[in-house]
Amino acid sequence: MKNKLPPFIEIYRALIATPSISATEEALDQSNADLITLLADWFKDLGFNVEVQPVPGTRNKFNMLASIGQGAGGLLLAGHTDTVPFDDGRWTRDPFTLTEHDGKLYGLGTADMKGFFAFILDALRDVDVTKLKKPLYILATADEETSMAGARYFAETTALRPDCAIIGEPTSLQPVRAHKGHISNAIRIQGQSGHSSDPARGVNAIELMHDAIGHILQLRDNLKERYHYEAFTVPYPTLNLGHIHGGDASNRICACCELHMDIRPLPGMTFNELNGLLNDALAPVSERWPGRLTVDELHPPIPGYECPPNHQLVEVVEKLLGAKTEVVNYCTEAPFIQTLCPTLVLGPGSINQAHQPDEYLETRFIKPTRELIIQVIHHFCWH
């Protein structure tokens, strides 16, 4: 039972020492099976029922759901098990060895966000789970850093409907109730190659893309004018042109040009709406040059997310922390968990440490995080 659990710092150390990198590049991508096994064993030791769920379409990735208590509702504490890859040349410490120095715990995943599971396990030492009046669930997901496949699949397949959920991403213990989404597309134009000495015998894809970009930039301006959410520091949907490539020689008519772009929609904007706006913007080019322009997703889209500001979860957490909820521009798994129940993003560590060399979590977060976890379990599972 509880006395089987290693000390907090040893749990943390074991999590960091177990690599679980997710990457779109197969050579860097790793299974999270070993980490899931670690977590599953610890939660079983605490008396939880544990289910391990293979995630389809991934390279041997798994979700874990640990549950205890009976009845409907309850609380879900969630987080992802994977980390981003690391740049060996920029780290001054071993990313897989937990190192404590000057009030900081260094290691890959200390803040983002394997460490959150160490906080949950440690807090449960002081919770009598036999007295829960509502269930407590712990969800550990796969591939948040790439496709969010774990959270997507869990949300699509589970019958659970907790009263509320908290995702322990690093927010410096400032509660987050909304964020923008993310859509990334490849705009591809197929021209007709030819010698540059006779332009009429070809179709220059770069010139067509130049025309398309003009329409896309007009869409960017329209998004800024039509949609507003003043709580965001950037209070409108953003559109960015991030990458372009076309042609292969100065004396050849360009046969193909490809542009990568993204849109970060506000909460409430649908993918159908956004895709319609993009297709409408590009319609003049498509109509003039039939069959030459295509639009494809680069990554599965992430919707915007918002927890109602007057929900009990928001009121309880704001009261416990003495802090108002915030909105942020980055993305999390919250849109998918929010389909099950009202969800907040709230956890130890700073988002500024996410994806950084020499990632760390400040030890000043240890005590308040532990106390907060105990308090929310008491509030949502004991009453």
Swiss-Prot record:
Pfam families associated with the record: M20_dimer (PF07687), Peptidase_M20 (PF01546)
Question: Cross-referenced InterPro entries, in alphabetical order?
Answer: AcOrn-deacetyl, ArgE/DapE_CS, Bact_exopeptidase_dim_dom, Peptidase_M20, Peptidase_M20_dimer, Peptidase_M20A
Q: Which domain of life is it from?
A: Bacteria
Q: Which Gene3D superfamilies match?
A: 3.30.70.360, Zn peptidases
Primary subcellular site in the record, as a coarse category: cytoplasm
Entry's EC annotation: 3.5.1.16
Query: Which cofactors, by name?
Result: Zn(2+); Co(2+); glutathione
Q: Which PANTHER family match?
A: ACETYLORNITHINE DEACETYLASE
- Oligomer status and interactors: Homodimer.
Stated role: Catalyzes the hydrolysis of the amide bond of N(2)-acetylated L-amino acids. Cleaves the acetyl group from N-acetyl-L-ornithine to form L-ornithine, an intermediate in L-arginine biosynthesis pathway, and a branchpoint in the synthesis of polyamines.
Query: What's the protein name?
Result: Acetylornithine deacetylase
Q: Which organism is it from?
A: Shigella boydii serotype 18 (strain CDC 3083-94 / BS512)
